[in-house]
């Protein structure tokens, strides 16, 4: 149950921060947080990561519903000792739902976190994207370092 609370917290934080950006910033406006490193930039994305597959809403709806269902099934099958995987899945669930809500209600995803790594301008992203990324990393860490292989029928 705690993993669903993590997902809910991600969705609330994601939607609140997006609302703030839409409400108080002009599209394209950028506010420096740390010069040459981190900015809040009002941006919209009608595709997937980095603008891929722009305008393919039904594909995104279908994929998201399948992913959310798979995450919920996986969470239900977790053992109590698999907390790291559960946290990762909770983050992934919240991130998937956060961006799904944007696609359904706005027909675009609000992005606003703009980071620079040296001279490289990283694509603008949001809280949901961050949660998805961290969730995937945690799931991989769990799988590679903590998961025990299932014993087959011998």
Curated annotation (Swiss-Prot):
- The active site is formed by 111, 129
Q: Which Pfam families does the UniProt record give?
A: Peptidase_A8
Primary residence: membrane
Tell me which InterPro entries the record gives. Answer: Peptidase_A8
Its record classes its membrane topology as: Multi-pass membrane protein
- Listed GO biological process terms: proteolysis
Annotated GO molecular function terms are: aspartic-type endopeptidase activity
Listed under GO cellular component are: plasma membrane
For this protein, what is the EC number? 3.4.23.36
Please give the pathway this protein is involved in. Answer: Protein modification; lipoprotein biosynthesis (signal peptide cleavage)
Record localization: Cell membrane
Q: Which HAMAP family match?
A: LspA
What role is this protein assigned?
This protein specifically catalyzes the removal of signal peptides from prolipoproteins.
| UniProt family annotation | Belongs to the peptidase A8 family.
| Official protein name in the record | Lipoprotein signal peptidase
């Amino acid at each position: 149950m705690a993993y669903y609370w993590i997902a809910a917290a991600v969705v609330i934080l994601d939607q609140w921060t997006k609302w703030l950006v839409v409400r108080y910033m002009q599209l394209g406006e950028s506010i420096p947080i740390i010069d040459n490193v981190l900015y809040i930039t009002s941006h919209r994305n009608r595709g997937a990561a980095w603008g891929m597959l722009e305008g393919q809403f039904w594909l995104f709806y279908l994929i998201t519903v399948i992913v959310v269902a798979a995450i919920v099934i996986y969470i239900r099958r977790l053992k109590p000792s698999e907390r790291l995987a559960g946290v990762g899945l909770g983050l992934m669930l919240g991130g998937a739902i956060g961006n799904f809500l944007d696609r359904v209600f706005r027909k675009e995803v609000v992005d606003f976190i703009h980071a620079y790594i040296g001279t490289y301008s990283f694509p603008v992203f949001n809280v949901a994207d961050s949660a998805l990324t961290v969730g995937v990393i945690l799931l991989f860490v769990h799988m590679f370092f903590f998961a025990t292989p299932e014993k087959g029928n011998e």
